[in-house]
Structure formats: C-alpha cells, structure tokens
C-alpha cells in the first residue's frame, strides 16, 4: 500500500548568547608558571557547559533553548509529536525494589530503532549512584565502565552522560532520559 502524503513543519531554532566573566588576580597574571591562557579557556569552557546544560534540560524557551524537561509528557504508548514519551519505573517515587533494571530495558526498546543507534542515557550523578548498583538476572551490572581512556561508561551498551540539571528520583519526576539528543 502507498503511504499518505508527507507533511513538513518548519521549526525555528533561535541562536542565543552565553558568556563568562572569569576572574584572574594580578598575582595569577604575573605567575610565569601558570599558563593563564589555558586556565582562562578552561574556566570559560566549564561556565559555558554549565549554562548550556541548564538551558537544554530545563530552559524555558524564552531567550534560551526550550529544555528537554519542559515539553509535555505522555505515556510512551500514546506518543504524539512534540511530546516526550516516558516509561514508568515500577516504583511510586523510585525504581522498583525488585528487578529495577527492567525499566531500562523497557525504555531502551521504547525508543524507535532508528534513534537507538546514536542514543545515550542522561541522568544526574545522584541517580547514577543508584543505577550503578542494578544487576540483571545473572548478577551482571547494567552499568559498564569505560573500555578505553576517552570512552564513556555505558548502560546496555549505550553511553551514559550525567548532568545535575536532571531531576532526582521522586514522584512525577523524569530522572533518566534516553534518546539521540543530536537529533532531538
């Protein structure tokens, strides 16, 4: 059978400005052992990363990006364009007490196959501390350490990123995200 007529939708992505104002004392500037250019670049990089992380996760969309967690949420089975689908964890305000890793398997396969290839996990450090203890039915941890110096740790073979702008475990919170954020 033929597919229906495709429709296109124009999306607007506004460019916003971020800035940093690193402070260096005269003593630091005069210190020949300190690579001031490298130090300043590092300070600016950290500040930009913190601002961008907050904007992309919780931003209001007013003079900044609209954050991932500000979109309407719907149960994944009822997914609609412009919404974020979710999978329940099995616990009221936390992960299920038995087999908590099952929610990760459910979330992994809830994401359409075309998006799984470039997908990664996103959570806070506090939630990651809980996740690292989850095991499968054979006693293997779901979390795996990096396999090389620059490689990320993984869950179910997909990279894990942490950002403390993600919410804590709790009722009606979405403490873990999984998707191809480059295509989101």
Question: PLM features: residue spans?
Answer:
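Structured, hydrophobic secondary-structure cores that serve as assembly/anchoring elements
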Residues: 1-184
